[in-house]
A protein has these predicted regions:
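Short hydrophobic beta-strand that contains or immediately precedes a catalytic carboxylate
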Residues: 39-41, 160-161, 295-298, 304
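Short beta-strand
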Residues: 297, 494-499
């Protein structure tokens, strides 16, 4: 069986450069820069049976969507009323046979994968979603949506990589950002994409095929530009499935494995603490509504790479276990440590800060839902050293009525920093950026791709992915959360929101760790003239010229979020309702009663954005309750000022008559407690690229 995720050959940088300079190649092999890219894409049409195609909601899936064009930039393609799975596989193998040394790429290929798999029965689809590979009618299929589709038959294999995650934007925006294609060519592609909803059998050859050919031609140019820029920065990924391939190259190039202990050699207690203490980035809205006044943002420059650059070597030090609080010198000197604590804030001003505003810098993960809250008290949680130090500063101020350190794992390192090279890449990127050298994009892509590999949960041959290291990953995110909290907890009345590595507030933050500047880990500050903040992650900023910028959204394209409609919703105190077309992929379809009918169809769905969230019963960290909102009590409308959100009143679950401690981060190969229900769903959808 073919190795699935980590079977690439590693070519050291020195050897790669020598081969390129001397035009040498390994026996029988073609150099990476000499391998041509072949672009792949497909198009579909909807067979409407409804009376109003222009307003088709298709809730029952009666208007079927068909794949009627699939092929490559070489000119090979297959077309027909509704292509079969075998037809699509065969054209892939035909192109591979004719172009054995080419690299095959697509852009945002998830839609195409579902359409290509139309003939696979439900049981087969469930199997391949779980296992990512299977035999079917003489073909051997490997698929990881968002990364690649691979088909093998008669010892001939074609793998199509999905380039989308390299760019994380629409194809048109990628062309514009990377200076690929002329203005008229890009306009033609945009026009074609806008007309996809009106594709029919009748205009396949006259309109669709010419547009499709132009798109593939530009896709090849985009792939060439990506490779040229990566190579110019000394980055030569062995695969082309996204930033993870870049991270894989960098980890191998800088011999990261030498700084990682064997997974089975890590003490069980450290592995347990790592799962309990890990938490992701902190998204949290504190105030929502319209604010007509100065708004300040402060963002950490490359926050995760910064935290990563200071990590210790885990292969040359020792984990030490402490019962109770370690000595102060140990806490001050340690880089990496995890602390098991419980706490509750005291009465008075301290309680006002914690209960009425900013909760402590530690998370609580609910066992059933897997959601994380930042609470004013905690029956038990493991946290990393950066956030623990924040709490110790508050402890010294006498802010707690209860603060217990139950145990700790502290890492004593030898002072070596295996990721110090990140700082060199960041500095080089700054120089390239100042000089207008596009290689800066490769440097940015490289260092920003690293953290994800350390936190990866899916993809390992034997369960544990190659670069998984949760103690490192947990320290990285904790460093970022601690920096946000350290600079802002005293200024809760001014805060609008946390956004992972940034803060929005109505006054400038005057205590920014590392200061303001362009260096790694310093802060970039900006000022705006207003904000409309609807709910966590959904907001509009107004620049200093009085123009509203494009919205920040979650799960809905920007063009569907209209500022005027959001304002109308505020004034009327109603939810903002957004309509969008959604392609129903298998993972989502299989969770619905009429899944077989709606799979591979387009539906019109309405998404609702309520003011501040969903009120009582919401799973959110904070919520808007009019009776508890001082601005509402004072008679201010949503469009008149910012309204303060209250901490969720959600209590802690009980286990054997006592409050349960914060639950562990779920790992498929190492279970502590039960898997949260939302994690089960997310795991299935992630495997099919739908998260």
């Amino acid at each position: 069986m073919v190795d699935f995720l980590f079977d690439e050959e590693f070519v050291p940088k020195s050897r790669a450069r020598t081969m390129r300079r001397n035009k040498q190649r390994a026996s029988g092999q073609v150099r990476g820069e000499d391998k041509p890219f072949i672009g792949w894409d497909g198009e579909g049409w909807t067979e409407h049976v409804c009376e109003t195609p222009e307003a088709c909601e298709n809730s029952n899936g009666s208007c079927k969507h068909h794949y009627y064009l699939f092929g490559a930039s070489t000119g090979h393609y297959v077309s027909g009323r509704s292509l079969s799975t075998a037809e699509c596989f065969e054209v892939m193998l035909d192109v591979k046979r004719d172009h054995p040394d080419a690299l095959h790429v697509a852009f945002s290929f998830k839609y195409d994968i579902d359409m290509i798999f139309k003939d696979l029965p439900t049981g087969a689809m469930r199997y391949i979603m779980k296992n990512n590979r299977m035999h079917w009618k003489g073909f051997y299929i490997e698929v990881l949506p968002g990364k690649w589709l691979q088909v093998t038959k008669d010892k001939l294999t074609c793998r199509i990589y999905d380039l989308f995650s390299f760019f994380a934007c629409s194809f048109v925006k990628a062309l514009e950002k990377w200076n690929v294609g002329t203005a008229s060519e890009i306009a033609h592609i945009k026009s074609g994409k806008d007309q996809r909803g009106s594709f029919t059998l009748d205009n396949l050859e006259t309109d669709v095929v010419p547009y499709w050919r132009d798109e593939l031609r530009l896709l090849v140019q985009l792939a060439d530009s990506l490779r040229d820029i990566l190579y110019s920065a000394g980055i030569r990924p062995a695969r082309w499935h996204g930033p993870g391939a870049v991270a894989d190259y960098l980890f191998r190039e800088y011999k990261t494995k030498l700084s990682m202990p064997a997974y089975e050699s890590i003490p069980v207690g450290v592995l347990d603490a790592g799962q309990y203490s890990y938490a992701g980035g902190r998204f949290e809205a504190f105030r929502i509504g319209l604010y007509d006044g100065p708004v300040y943002s402060a963002d950490i420059n490359s926050a995760y790479p910064y935290a990563m650059s200071g990590l210790p070597n885990l292969a040359t030090g020792t984990w030490i276990h402490h019962n109770g609080m370690p000595e102060q010198t140990t806490i001050s000197d340690v880089t990496l440590g995890m602390f098991h604590i419980r706490y509750e804030y005291a009465e008075g001003p301290s309680r006002d800060i914690a209960y009425g505003g900013m909760p402590a810098a530690s998370h609580y993960r609910y066992p059933k839902s897997g959601t994380m809250h930042f609470r004013n008290r905690n029956p038990g949680v493991w946290i990393h050293a950066p956030e623990f130090r924040n709490l110790l500063r508050q402890l010294q101020l006498g802010m707690f009525s209860k603060f217990d350190v139950i145990e700790a794992w502290v890492y004593i390192d030898d002072g070596t920093k295996p990721f110090a090279w990140i700082l060199d890449i960041y500095r080089q990127r700054q120089e390239w950026k100042a000089a207008g050298n596009p290689a800066e994009l490769a440097a940015k892509l490289g260092i920003n791709s690293l953290y994800g590999k350390l936190a990866q949960r899916i993809g390992g041959k034997q369960g544990v992915p190659t670069w998984h290291q949760l103690q490192w990953a947990g320290h990285i995110t904790s460093t970022c959360r601690a920096m946000l909290y350290d600079t802002s907890w005293r200024h809760f009345p001014d805060l609008i929101a946390y956004e992972t590595d940034g803060i929005y507030s109505t006054r400038p933050m005057d205590e920014l760790p590392n200061g303001v500047g362009t260096a790694l880990g310093q802060w970039e500050v900006e000022e705006y003239s207003g904000v409309l903040y609807l709910q966590s992650g959904v907001y509009w900023l107004r620049d200093m010229d009085g123009n509203w910028k494009k919205p920040k959204t979650r799960g809905v394209p920007q063009q569907h979020m209209e500022f005027d409609k959001a304002m109308e919703a505020l004034v009327s105190k109603k939810s903002l309702k957004v309509t969008q077309n959604q392609f129903i992929r298998f993972g989502l379809a299989d969770m619905r009663r009429n899944g077989n009918n709606i799979w591979r169809t387009w539906q019109t769905n309405e998404k609702e954005f309520s003011f501040g969230g969903d009120g009582f019963g919401s799973a959110g960290k904070r919520l808007h309750v009019a009776k508890a909102c001082k601005e509402c009590v004072q008679g201010y409308g949503y469009e008149e000022t910012l309204h303060t959100l209250m901490l969720s009143p959600k209590g802690f679950p009980f286990v054997d008559g006592v409050h349960a401690e914060s639950a562990a981060h779920y790992l498929p190969w190492r279970k502590l407690g039960s898997q949260p229900e939302n994690s089960k769903t997310a795991q299935v959808l992630t495997r099919w690229g739908e998260s």
